């Protein structure tokens, strides 16, 4: 068994997550591809594949239990984070991964092909220019500097009725919450437990205020 697989198994054992053999293989396969492409294309500042398991894989998949609905878009996905790990964990849900940089989307297409992911659609576009045929149950991001930027640039993406924004943040984002636009409110803040990750992680769920 590879060092990556051994480490992944150890990390998963520290959570309540139910991860199949196939999913474990796909998660390791994703990290191997990310490590390989990263050397040429600089897709992430994390260089050590073992560190990627903590900072990219576990940090993404712990969000999965909080995804309500079936159709999600990951905006500013970079090399596919958190979208690819979540798509591996939730084959019954559909994930659209959006980024404006061609090299990132090319990488994601390679991942989709190599791992045989049927529920991922890569999209090269600026988020404010992307007009989906159908709106989303959830708009995910861990890339945006501020939640205000996220909700204003992505305001056209969630479903009118029950669509939400899901922002992955570090420390409790109280300062950011005070700056949110009038039409948007925080419905829940969830403290995330990521094994062996230093620092706090929070998932902030935001929605449109009822008219």
Swiss-Prot record:
Belongs to the methyltransferase superfamily. RNA methyltransferase RsmG family. The lineage of its organism: Bacteria, Pseudomonadati, Pseudomonadota, Gammaproteobacteria, Vibrionales. It is found in: Cytoplasm. It is an enzyme of class 2 (transferase). Keywords: Cytoplasm, Methyltransferase, rRNA processing, S-adenosyl-L-methionine, Transferase. The gene is rsmG. Specifically methylates the N7 position of guanine in position 527 of 16S rRNA. This is Ribosomal RNA small subunit methyltransferase G. Its EC number is 2.1.1.170. It catalyses: guanosine(527) in 16S rRNA + S-adenosyl-L-methionine = N(7)-methylguanosine(527) in 16S rRNA + S-adenosyl-L-homocysteine.
């Amino acid at each position: 068994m590879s060092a990556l697989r051994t480490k992944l198994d150890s990390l998963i054992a520290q959570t309540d997550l139910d991860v199949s053999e196939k999913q474990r293989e796909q998660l390791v396969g994703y990290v191997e591809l990310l490590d390989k492409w990263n050397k040429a294309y600089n897709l992430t500042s994390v260089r050590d594949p073992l560190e990627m398991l903590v900072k990219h894989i576990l940090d993404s998949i712990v969000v999965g239990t909080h995804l309500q609905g079936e159709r999600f878009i990951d905006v500013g996905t970079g090399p596919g984070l958190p979208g690819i790990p979540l798509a591996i964990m939730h084959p019954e849900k559909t994930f659209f991964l959006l980024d404006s940089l061609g090299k990132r989307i090319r990488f994601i297409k390679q991942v989709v092909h190599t791992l045989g992911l049927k529920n991922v659609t890569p999209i090269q576009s600026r988020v404010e220019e992307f007009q989906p045929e159908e709106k989303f149950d959830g708009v995910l991001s861990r890339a945006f500097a501020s939640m205000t930027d996220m909700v204003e640039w992505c305001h056209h993406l969630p479903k009118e009725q029950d669509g939400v924004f899901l922002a992955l943040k570090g420390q409790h984002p109280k300062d950011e919450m005070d700056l949110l636009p009038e039409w948007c409110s925080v419905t829940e803040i969830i403290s995330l437990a990521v094994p062996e990750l230093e620092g706090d992680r929070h998932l902030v769920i935001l929605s449109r205020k009822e008219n």
